[in-house]
Amino acid sequence: MLMTRPNLKGRSFLAEKDFTQEELLYFLDLAAELKEKKKNGIPHHYLEGKNVALLFEKTSTRTRCAFTVACTDLGANPEYLGKSDIQLGKKESVEDTAKVLGRMFDGIEFRGFNHETVESLAQNSGVPVWNGLTDMWHPTQTLADLLTIREHVGKLKNVKLVYVGDGRNNVANSLLVGGAIVGMDVRICTPETLWPAQEVIDLAKKYNEQVMITSNVEEAVANADVIYTDVWVSMGEEEKFAERVKLLKPYQVNMKMIKETGNENVIFLHCLPAFHDVETMYGEEVYEKYGLKEMEVTDEVFRSKHSKVFDQAENRMHTIKAVMAATLGNME
């Protein structure tokens, strides 16, 4: 059952902080409805005849696939523009690029590095712009996370979510602020040198004073409903690998940590890709250099009943579809 529909037509989706609790929950309700329609083969062409630009400065599997399928399901035409196709800030300014794309497309997705780039696209294009990831925020991921949590835990309010790992990255920032907005008990567990920026902590505390930032694993995971982790090194930070392995090894999600929650129904989430074995070239390289067969999560946890990572990956598509439909679609 959809809650009262807020008017989001024409809005850009750049960060969770730009939306109220009611608006974020509406995105989740709409995503659940669209997920059900897709499952039952019910057409939902809310973007019939629209053209959508998909700008990718950073490579992607899930984000690109999710936006492409979401566009197609909604009746829109997606146009992929990769790193070699766009000249943002090189041969053409972001402002000029935004103005050109806004004349040709009805909506723009951007996945890249600087958050200022997606803000400039939104400011200058005249069409809704959706953030597929920047160094600061990853809001489409957080919506998928929240939908997955609601499906498996049954609610969001007062749910204890523990993010373990690099607390300064975009996923941690978005979970901290987005989770606080919807009333969750968010805990970031990481070494002090990797705590979120103070401005992000302060922003989260505006919505929920209960947020916890700690380096103590036992304290963080006690009674947790959700354990969440991400890669130890983000794209563009590869030179920090040895340092991060040393820092974050005690924060690996393993069965000992799962048991320390005291909750046999605790769920495990990861935005993927996850380094839980040596079945990739990257995994082999890490094993050769550092002797680690598993990194941020053990294979045992990744493949266990606790793991909901593939539901979470699928939900990227449904939540992205909801964001595009609500901000660009004909929802009457």
UniProtKB/Swiss-Prot annotation:
It comes from the Bacteria. InterPro entries: Asp/Orn_carbamoyltranf_P-bd, Asp/Orn_carbamoylTrfase, Asp/Orn_carbamoylTrfase_sf, Asp_carbamoyltransf_Asp/Orn-bd, Orn/put_carbamltrans, OTCase_ArgI. One of its GO terms (biological process) is arginine catabolic process to ornithine. The keyword Transferase applies. Reversibly catalyzes the transfer of the carbamoyl group from carbamoyl phosphate (CP) to the N(epsilon) atom of ornithine (ORN) to produce L-citrulline. GO terms for cellular component: cytoplasm. The keyword Cytoplasm applies. It catalyses: carbamoyl phosphate + L-ornithine = L-citrulline + phosphate + H(+). Belongs to the aspartate/ornithine carbamoyltransferase superfamily. OTCase family. It is found in: Cytoplasm. Its EC number is 2.1.3.3. Pathway: Amino-acid degradation; L-arginine degradation via ADI pathway; carbamoyl phosphate from L-arginine: step 2/2. Carbamoyl phosphate binds at residues 60-63, 87, 111, 138-141, 271-272, 316. It comes from Bacillus cereus (strain ATCC 10987 / NRS 248). This is Ornithine carbamoyltransferase, catabolic. Disulfide bonds: none annotated. GO terms for molecular function: amino acid binding; ornithine carbamoyltransferase activity. PANTHER family: ORNITHINE CARBAMOYLTRANSFERASE, CATABOLIC, ORNITHINE CARBAMOYLTRANSFERASE, MITOCHONDRIAL. PROSITE patterns: CARBAMOYLTRANSFERASE. It is an enzyme of class 2 (transferase). Keywords: Arginine metabolism, Cytoplasm, Transferase. Pfam families: OTCace, OTCace_N. L-ornithine binds at residues 170, 230, 234-235.
